[in-house]
């Protein structure tokens, strides 16, 4: 409302000073003050009618427009703040990108070393089991060979002993020897 009064006063003063400037000219005849007064009154009546008929709507329009502009400026300020935050976040992430890359590489290297150690450990255990199994197999084969050799040697000793006894002992001595050992076996 105050702005409208100031605008109306400024318009009236502009018309007044313009008419004064026109009147000071060398045209030879003065202005038609009656026509000028009629025009001013006509303008004031026209402006008053427009103000009465649509004054509230005009004020509401400009007030609504003003509030809309203020709201839009607030929204733009909020969006600007959000954009600055997002920009700062992106810049921070870009700055941290190298350290993140190094961390990821270090993590993968550590995982690789762990897998390598697990594979080596498994291979060592498998080699140990294979070596132990080979030792057992070799021991069993040696034991079997020794047992076979003992059995063969026992057979050969028996054959040699029989042959030797058959050559040195007579049948009578042989029977005495058998009786003697049978008596020992029975008594024990």
From Swiss-Prot:
Keywords: ATP synthesis, Cell inner membrane, Cell membrane, CF(0), Hydrogen ion transport, Ion transport, Membrane, Transmembrane, Transmembrane helix, Transport. The chain crosses the membrane at residues 7-26. It is a single-pass membrane protein. InterPro entries: ATP_synth_b/b'su_bac/chlpt, ATP_synthase_B_chain. One of its GO terms (molecular function) is proton-transporting ATP synthase activity, rotational mechanism. It is found in: Cell inner membrane. Its main location: membrane. One of its GO terms (cellular component) is plasma membrane. It comes from the Bacteria. Belongs to the ATPase B chain family. F-type ATPases have 2 components, F(1) - the catalytic core - and F(0) - the membrane proton channel. F(1) has five subunits: alpha(3), beta(3), gamma(1), delta(1), epsilon(1). F(0) has three main subunits: a(1), b(2) and c(10-14). The alpha and beta chains form an alternating ring which encloses part of the gamma chain. F(1) is attached to F(0) by a central stalk formed by the gamma and epsilon chains, while a peripheral stalk is formed by the delta and b chains. F(1)F(0) ATP synthase produces ATP from ADP in the presence of a proton or sodium gradient. F-type ATPases consist of two structural domains, F(1) containing the extramembraneous catalytic core and F(0) containing the membrane proton channel, linked together by a central stalk and a peripheral stalk. During catalysis, ATP synthesis in the catalytic domain of F(1) is coupled via a rotary mechanism of the central stalk subunits to proton translocation. Component of the F(0) channel, it forms part of the peripheral stalk, linking F(1) to F(0). This is ATP synthase subunit b.
């Amino acid at each position: 409302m105050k702005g409208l009064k100031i605008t109306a006063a400024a318009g009236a003063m502009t018309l007044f000073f313009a008419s004064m400037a026109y009147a000071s000219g060398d045209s030879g005849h003065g202005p038609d003050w009656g026509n000028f007064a009629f025009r001013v009154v006509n303008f004031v009546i026209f402006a008053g009618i427009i103000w009465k008929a649509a004054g509230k709507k005009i004020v509401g329009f400009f007030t609504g427009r003003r509030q809309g502009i203020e709201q839009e400026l607030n929204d733009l300020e909020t969006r600007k703040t959000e954009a600055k935050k997002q920009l700062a976040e992106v810049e921070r992430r870009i700055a941290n990108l190298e350290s993140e890359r190094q961390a990821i590489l270090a993590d993968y290297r550590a995982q690789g070393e762990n897998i390598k150690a697990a594979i080596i450990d498994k291979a060592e255990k498998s080699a140990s089991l294979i070596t132990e199994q080979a030792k057992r197999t070799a021991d069993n084969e040696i034991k079997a060979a020794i047992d076979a050799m003992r059995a063969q040697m026992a057979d050969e000793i028996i054959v040699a002993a029989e042959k030797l006894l058959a050559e040195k002992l007579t049948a009578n001595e042989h029977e005495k020897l058998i009786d003697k050992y049978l008596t020992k076996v029975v008594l024990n």
